Amino acid sequence: FFSYSPFKENAARFNIRAVWAPSMESGVTIPGEHVWRNTAAQARYYTFDSERYQMIEDFQGLRDIAAHAPYDHIYVLSNTQKYGGGGIYNFYGISAAHHPNRTGKIYVHEFGHVLLGLGDEYIGNVSYNDMYPTDVEPWEANLTTLTDFGRKEWKKMLDTKTPVPTPVNEKTPQKLGVYEGGGYVNKGVYRPWPNCLMNNLHTIDIFCPVCSQAIRKQIDFLCR
């Protein structure tokens, strides 16, 4: 977690407490593979029929477990190597604790949802469509439909010469812009970078400037 900026630079402002919850069985339920596990949290994949979407239905039961320590946010590390997780703003997050090479990336991606509600910047491969009406400005800091883009901090961070929308240029993969495609759809929703930890976890390991600034502002707000 603290290997990734801007969490790394703010490590001293976090308190992390682990609650160990013993279970009758080990692992996570995977309905699509007919794998069923009797565990304390009852975590399972295939939420909304998405293989990688791991969640916990009994939130009150999860809160009972977490209540053994003081907390502001709940994050569950599930005992599995299977890629996946989930995170909901001001609710809780969960991800695989033992994925061979992306455990940390999944953790910080989902925590981006949990801590301040960053939006998913990737396209497709979900069970829901039209989550962002194109005539409504998303409240998430890192997504826009350009309906009311001027009110976002993102707009103020742009170079005045940057075209909006911004064409993807492979020679400048980390140029801040307004790139079409995000919020699960190809058209009508825009993201700040061609790629970011809120987008494709396979090819990058940093947050874009918009996400980083939003995270820092939320940490500052919570630590006043």
Language-model segment annotations:
Residues 1-64:
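Propeptide-to-catalytic entry region of secreted or membrane-anchored zinc metalloproteases
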Residues 1-8, 114, 118, 218-222:
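Structured segments of extracytoplasmic/periplasmic soluble domains
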Residues 10-16, 69-74, 194:
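Loop/turn elements at helix/coil->beta-strand transitions in domains of secreted/extracellular proteins
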Residues 22-26, 80-84, 101-103, 121-122, ...:
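Solvent-exposed loop/turn segments at secondary-structure junctions
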Residues 54-93:
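Well-ordered beta-sheet/strand-loop patches within structured domains
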Residues 85-110:
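Short pre-active-site segment immediately N-terminal to the catalytic Zn-binding motif
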Residues 110-127:
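Catalytic Zn2+-binding segment of zinc metalloproteases
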